[in-house]
Amino acid sequence: MLAKRIIPCLDIKDGQTVKGTNFVNLRQAGDPVELGRAYSEQGADELVFLDITASHEGRKTFAELVRRIAANISIPFTVGGGINELSDVDRLLNAGADKISINSSAIRNPQLIDDIAKHFGSQVCVLAVDARQTGNGWKCYLNGGRIETDKELRTWTKEAQERGAGEVLFTSMNHDGVKTGYANEALAELASQLSIPVIASGGAGRMEHFRDAFTLGKADAALAASVFHFGEIKIPELKSYLCGQGITVR
């Protein structure tokens, strides 16, 4: 079995790390460069940087901040937010990103997935999906969860895989920031239908939640923000807990 990955996420707004509940009520959580360095030193497997205002405000991800974070970490680094064309990808990879996460832009222009995979390789392309469970399944949302689309979670992620996405980062909007556990049932469905890795996001509150994402949700990686930013869970302790639960971690 491949080792499971633990991934802290930096949600960036106006150059600062923030964390909200159900995608609203944002509060500040610290300097992204300092946090990135700390997570890298603590043994995080990867780092995700999402400029949560970039798509909404129609501006480009702040490449200079990406460059500063990349210079301070020694782990793979995924960047998302406001990436609409290949030149955006090129600029961020040059700034030090290892992978690019696309969300709203991929829904609006699915061909972007094909183009990134073709020009830079599937391993660079992470499809991020913000989805909410309603009476009729899981619906995908645009612009940081502000706009509902007609895309359904399973069909959209399957299409993205076929177009060349190398990973899926699935955030449950129902679970985000609530700290009651990940959307394990939906995760397990995605894991069973996709051949690319699935990253669980939204809902981590306790160490058991990470265990459940891996055992029940069959996720390949688990992403979290506030539990790490506010020191509620420490990465070395989380990894030794998971080891004790029989889960292979790096």
Curated annotation (Swiss-Prot):
The active site is at D11, D130. One of its GO terms (biological process) is L-histidine biosynthetic process. Pathway: Amino-acid biosynthesis; L-histidine biosynthesis; L-histidine from 5-phospho-alpha-D-ribose 1-diphosphate: step 5/9. Its main location: cytoplasm. It catalyses: 5-[(5-phospho-1-deoxy-D-ribulos-1-ylimino)methylamino]-1-(5-phospho-beta-D-ribosyl)imidazole-4-carboxamide + L-glutamine = D-erythro-1-(imidazol-4-yl)glycerol 3-phosphate + 5-amino-1-(5-phospho-beta-D-ribosyl)imidazole-4-carboxamide + L-glutamate + H(+). It is found in: Cytoplasm. Its EC number is 4.3.2.10. The keyword Lyase applies. Gene3D superfamilies: Aldolase class I. GO terms for cellular component: cytoplasm. Keywords: Amino-acid biosynthesis, Cytoplasm, Histidine biosynthesis, Lyase. GO terms for molecular function: imidazoleglycerol-phosphate synthase activity; lyase activity. SUPFAM superfamilies: Ribulose-phoshate binding barrel (SSF51366). The keyword Acyltransferase does not apply. It is an enzyme of class 4 (lyase). Disulfide bonds: none annotated. NCBIfam families: hisF. IGPS catalyzes the conversion of PRFAR and glutamine to IGP, AICAR and glutamate. The HisF subunit catalyzes the cyclization activity that produces IGP and AICAR from PRFAR using the ammonia provided by the HisH subunit. Heterodimer of HisH and HisF. Belongs to the HisA/HisF family. This is Imidazole glycerol phosphate synthase subunit HisF. It comes from Bacteroides fragilis (strain ATCC 25285 / DSM 2151 / CCUG 4856 / JCM 11019 / LMG 10263 / NCTC 9343 / Onslow / VPI 2553 / EN-2).
